[in-house]
Amino acid sequence: MRRVFLIFTLIIVACGIAFFFLTKYQPHIVSPLGQLIEKPLDKYTIANLMKRQFIGSQIVLDDAVATTSAFTSYRFHFTSDGKKVTGFVHVPNDASEKNKKPVIVQFRGYVDREKYTPGEGTKRSSEVFANNGFVTIAPDFLGYGGSASPSADVFEERFETYTTALNLIASIGSLSRVDPSRVGIWGHSNGGQIALTVAEILNKPIPAALWAPVSKSFPYSILYFTDEFDDHGKALRKRLAKFENDYDVERYSLTNYVDRIMGPIQIHEGMADEAVPQKWSDELVKVLKDKRKDATNAAELNYFIYPGADHNLMPAWNLVVSRDIQFFSKYLR
């Protein structure tokens, strides 16, 4: 009996030792799914913005700042992703809840923050559009006018221009004198880049007029202009190196999603433009034509080149804006 008890005890001890070593030295297997951690700027990839539903907010018209016989200009504000964004809106005087007007959403080009004044880059064209029966609305963007501060991250600040634009378009229906089913987009320079990206994300037949648009791939589209920086872009390139280490830049580049632009497009380019090379617009038009050549009902594509015209389309400005009035009237009336 004692012998049986001893054997039983030895078996128990042996099992305990075996269990100890098996559990202590067994390789630790980590599920690859557990390492798929979303990074902060992943939400701004064009593909992810396509999936997002933009709900919008109330556009609040603040005090009227100017009134003419044809329209009234207001400062406005709305909320974009929890941040206040201000801007300018021009409303034809005959607009009402029973006579709703089409709207042109305008995106300006780059302006130095310290030199910016509300309406800069859009005010002159918006007044002409309003004179011709269109409501126009242009955001200052975060960090400008009376808007809240943008992200401290230079790349997120850029991506916030897209979400601001998309939230603004989603908010159009809150204006009682505007017909939200008749929306056009206008963009100049970097605002053209915003307009193109918005058109890709929305993937709707929205008419867009683009003046000398920045249309190259990201991040080349920003590196191109760094020779104007005090440090010639050294700090930005350093941040970009880190960004490229963490993210796939191709997922943020509008050039990879041009086939999603569904609406009619009208592009204007000055042959004497020293800010945006004419060849950029030449290449954009070629890509758009190639993407649309097999479409059964391809949307209209107009491309106008102006000899001697600069980045602001001077001295052809009057002709350019008159062509845009005809263009928007065709699709929004």
Explain the meaning of each model-derived region:
Residues F155-S176:
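Alpha/beta-hydrolase active-site loop
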Residues M1-A70:
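N-terminal targeting or regulatory segments adjacent to alpha/beta-hydrolase or S9 domains
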Residues Q53-K98:
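N-terminal cap/lid segment of alpha/beta-hydrolase-fold proteins
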Residues G263, P277-V287:
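Short alpha-helix in the alpha/beta-hydrolase fold that links the catalytic acid
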